[in-house]
UniProtKB/Swiss-Prot annotation:
One of its GO terms (molecular function) is magnesium ion binding. GO terms for cellular component: cytoplasm. The keyword Lipid metabolism does not apply. Keywords: Cytoplasm, Magnesium, Metal-binding, Pantothenate biosynthesis, Plasmid, Transferase. Pfam families: Pantoate_transf. This is 3-methyl-2-oxobutanoate hydroxymethyltransferase. Catalyzes the reversible reaction in which hydroxymethyl group from 5,10-methylenetetrahydrofolate is transferred onto alpha-ketoisovalerate to form ketopantoate. The keyword Cell inner membrane does not apply. 3-methyl-2-oxobutanoate binds at D49, S50, D88, K118.
Length: 280
C-alpha cells in the first residue's frame, strides 16, 4: 500500500496495517504548498512542533503554542487529499493529566482536520495514550530522543545505548499496549531500533534510527537543504535549496539595483494588445 495508490485519505488503521510491509514514508509540513507537493508521495504528513524552530526561529520546540499548531495544521490540511495528517501536541498541552490531553487533542483535531495526534513519552504517558484512544483519538507515540524533554536529557544525544536500551524497549511496549497505532523512534542505535521493530506489533517510524524500521520521517527543510550549517548525521540532503534560493535572491537584488528588472516583458503597455482577426 502507498499513498499514491489511495483515492481517499489514509487512516490510522491503514498506517498500522503497513507494519512489516512496504516502508511508510513521511515528512513534516507546515504550509499548504509544501503539503501539496508531498501528498502523492507520503503516507502520512506530520505537522511537527519543529515548526517553531524551522519557521519561527525559536531555539527549541518548547515555545510552540496550541495556536501555532492550529494555524499550521489547518494550512497543511488544505493541501492534502490522500496522505494522512498527524499533528504534534505542543509542550505543556498534554503532560498534566489525561483530561488535559483529551481537551487539547480534541481541539487540535477539530480545528485543523488532523486524523491523529503525536505526543512524546513512553511508560509515563501510557495512561494518557490509553485515555485518548478509548475516546476516539488516534495517537502516534514518540520515544528515544524527545525534543520537548531536551532540558532533562542534557542535549540532542543518542538515546538507548548500553543500559538505557531496556527502558526504551519498555517504553515501546508500553505505548503499543496502550493503543498507539505507531511509534516514532528518534536518534537511537540502529540495532536497538531493529529490536524494537521486531518486538512491538505497531509500525516503528525512524528518524535517526534504522532502515529496518517500518517507516521513516524527516524534517522537510533539513532534507531539502534549506539550512547550511545545520546538518545532523541522520539527515540526507536530497537537494540544496537554501543556496539556490539565496543565489536567486542575490540575482534579483542585483537586477533591481541595475534597473534591469522589471524589463519590458514584465511591464504593461498603455493600450491592450489588439486581437488578431478571426479567419473564416
Amino acid at each position: 500500500m502507498s499513498a499514491s495508490s489511495q483515492k481517499t485519505a489514509l487512516t490510522a488503521e491503514d498506517i498500522r496495517a503497513m507494519k512489516g510491509r512496504t516502508p511508510i514514508v513521511s515528512l513534516t509540513a507546515y504550509t499548504t504548498p509544501m503539503a501539496q507537493l508531498m501528498d502523492e508521495h507520503c503516507d502520512f504528513v506530520l505537522v511537527g512542533d519543529s515548526v517553531g524552530m524551522v519557521l519561527h526561529g525559536l531555539p527549541s520546540t518548547l515555545g510552540v503554542t496550541m495556536e501555532m499548531m492550529i494555524l499550521h495544521g489547518a494550512a497543511v490540511a488544505r493541501g492534502l487529499k490522500r496522505a494522512m495528517m498527524v499533528i504534534d501536541m505542543p509542550f505543556g498541552s498534554y503532560e498534566q493529566s489525561p483530561a488535559q490531553a483529551f481537551a487539547n487533542a480534541a481541539r487540535l483535531m477539530a480545528e485543523t482536520g488532523a486524523a491523529a495526534v503525536k505526543l512524546e513519552g513512553g511508560e509515563e504517558m501510557a495512561d494518557t495514550i490509553r485515555f485518548l484512544v478509548k475516546r476516539g483519538i488516534p495517537v502516534m507515540a514518540h520515544i528515544g530522543l524527545t525534543p520537548q524533554s531536551i532540558n532533562t536529557l542534557g542535549g540532542y544525544k543518542v538515546q538507548g545505548r548500553d543500559d538505557a536500551a531496556k527502558p526504551l524497549i519498555a517504553d515501546a511496549r508500553a505505548v503499543a499496549e496502550a493503543g498507539a497505532f505507531a511509534v516514532v523512534l528518534e536518534k537511537v542505535p540502529a540495532s536497538l531500533a531493529d529490536q524494537v521493530t521486531e518486538i512491538v506489533d505497531i509500525p516503528t517510524i525512524g528518524i535517526g534510527a534504522s532502515a529496518g524500521c517500518d517507516g521513516q520521517v524527516l524534517v522537510v527543510d533539513d532534507m531539502l537543504g534549506f539550512f547550511g550549517a545545520f546538518k545532523p548525521k541522520f539527515v540526507k540532503r536530497y537537494a540544496e535549496l537554501g543556496p539556490a534560493a539565496e543565489e536567486a535572491i542575490a540575482d534579483y537584488a542585483s537586477e533591481v539595483r541595475a534597473r534591469r528588472f522589471p524589463s519590458a516583458e514584465h511591464t504593461f503597455a498603455d493600450h491592450a494588445p489588439q486581437k488578431a482577426p478571426q479567419q473564416d
